[in-house]
């Protein structure tokens, strides 16, 4: 397990915290509904995916009444609302590999919108499996840096069954096998509380450093448009902004 990353965690991912709450809540509710419908129980202790979804909802301050409504809706036999999990893969400008995970009630609509976004911003939407070999599929659990010392979080990650941990100036990020993700998440949640973020995702094997401001802005625009789509849950890419470019963009 590695203790510290060589670079600051400066990969620019405009996540849920940068979106309007309505869009954040839409994505969270979809995940709750899907977790209930695909799980064996609507009791979080017996449904790890639901527990994770509820943790995410609470960390984003989704009102309790909306959480309860989503769970009740998913349990209503007369409610035919359902979402299909689907993955899209392609290349953004300058050869950046992109993986998109979506929950959709209309695959044709989502595919059309994702393809349109790629085309508009200079990317190419490929077939499923066209870029995933450039990533590791694993669990990710992130805590703020002040939750524990590097040594303590390192030991906790090992005990939880984590494979790797990276600590930088801002966060501790623990990586797990997919099979061990929910067990590790439960252990760490019991020890440190709800994490800032947790998910099964795609982590690049190698990253492409972007040190040109205009190239970075073009890429980030595509990422932003994709993440604004209600059907898109997460976007992953094998890129990292150089510190200089990151700071310039942050100042604009």
From Swiss-Prot:
One Pfam family per UniProt:
TACO1_YebC_N
Its localization reads:
Cytoplasm
Keyword annotations for this protein, in alphabetical order, are: Cytoplasm, DNA-binding, Transcription, Transcription regulation
Q: Where is this region: Disordered?
A: 1-22
**What is a biological process (GO) this protein takes part in?**
regulation of DNA-templated transcription
Keyword Transmembrane in the entry? The reply is no
* GO annotation, cellular component aspect: cytoplasm
Q: Which SUPFAM superfamilies match?
A: YebC-like
Give the molecular function GO annotations. DNA binding
The UniProt entry, under Gene3D superfamilies, shows: 1.10.10.200, 3.30.70.980
Give the family this protein belongs to, as stated in its UniProt record.
Belongs to the TACO1 family.
Its recorded name reads Probable transcriptional regulatory protein RT0442
Species name: Rickettsia typhi (strain ATCC VR-144 / Wilmington)
- Provide the taxonomic classification: Bacteria, Pseudomonadati, Pseudomonadota, Alphaproteobacteria, Rickettsiales
